[in-house]
């Protein structure tokens, strides 16, 4: 009998091509879950899937842009068609321009809200009916400490405040259906995203995370 905690479970991780999403996928696979890994960078997904399989896990890549509702829906449907269930949905895909409001373009506004807010809504909307039918499921939403604390990054912070609020509201809506909702609000994590931040914003995030 397997001692892995997630044997028999099926998980879908968005934003799995790097950073926190990649780490989450590896951890889930190590605990026995079948892991669907989704992102736009298929080459990286294939590399990650190979690493998981070589370690004895089960993973399959799905190329998807979560800002496209049709692609996000198809991503979830692919998991359901292949495995018949979806137990864990981790919405890790995210993007940010950690800069003051006047230094952020309108194109960047749209991009942050498209990925950080609409992208996760599309995936959740597609997954919820099956989770309700199962009577169980776990939805994980990647927010950020910047959604709670003040930083010179108005638009990014606003998008993450929205994700935190949505997680809290969704938890109240679907708890009766046996579905758990978790919001993760980390400070600065050593990933590609943080490495592209301005130094003052990165240091501010680390300072707040330590207090």
Predicted features along the sequence, with ranges:
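Substrate-binding pocket helix/loop in short-chain dehydrogenase/reductase
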Residues: 100-101, 108-110
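Active-site loop-to-helix junction immediately N-terminal to the catalytic Tyr of the SDR YXXXK motif
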Residues: 104, 150-158, 169
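Residue(s) in the substrate-gating loop at a strand-loop-helix junction
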Residues: 144
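Active-site helix of classical SDR
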Residues: 124, 159
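The beta1-alpha1 cofactor-binding region of Rossmann-like NAD(H)/NADP(H)-dependent oxidoreductases
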Residues: 42-43, 63-74, 106
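Conserved glycine-rich cofactor-binding loop
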Residues: 10, 17-18
């Amino acid at each position: 009998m397997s001692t892995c905690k997630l044997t028999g479970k099926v998980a879908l991780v968005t934003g799995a091509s790097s950073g926190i999403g990649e780490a989450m996928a590896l951890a889930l696979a190590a605990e026995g879950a079948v892991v669907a890994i989704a992102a736009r960078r298929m080459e990286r997904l294939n590399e990650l899937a190979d690493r998981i399989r070589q370690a004895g896990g089960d993973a399959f890549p799905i190329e998807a842009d979560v800002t496209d509702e049709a692609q996000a829906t198809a991503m979830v449907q692919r998991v359901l068609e292949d495995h018949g269930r979806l137990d864990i949905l981790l919405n890790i895909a995210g993007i940010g321009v950690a800069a003051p409001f006047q230094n952020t373009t309108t194109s960047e506004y749209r991009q942050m809200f498209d990925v950080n807010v609409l992208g996760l809504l599309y995936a959740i909307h597609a997954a919820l009916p099956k989770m309700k039918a199962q009577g169980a499921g776990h939805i994980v939403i990647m927010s950020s400490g910047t959604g709670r604390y003040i930083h010179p990054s108005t638009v990014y912070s606003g998008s993450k405040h929205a994700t935190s609020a949505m997680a809290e509201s969704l938890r109240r809506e679907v708890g009766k259906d046996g579905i758990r909702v978790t919001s993760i609000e980390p400070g600065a994590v050593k990933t590609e995203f943080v490495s592209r931040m301005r130094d003052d914003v990165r240091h501010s995030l680390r300072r707040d995370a330590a207090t």
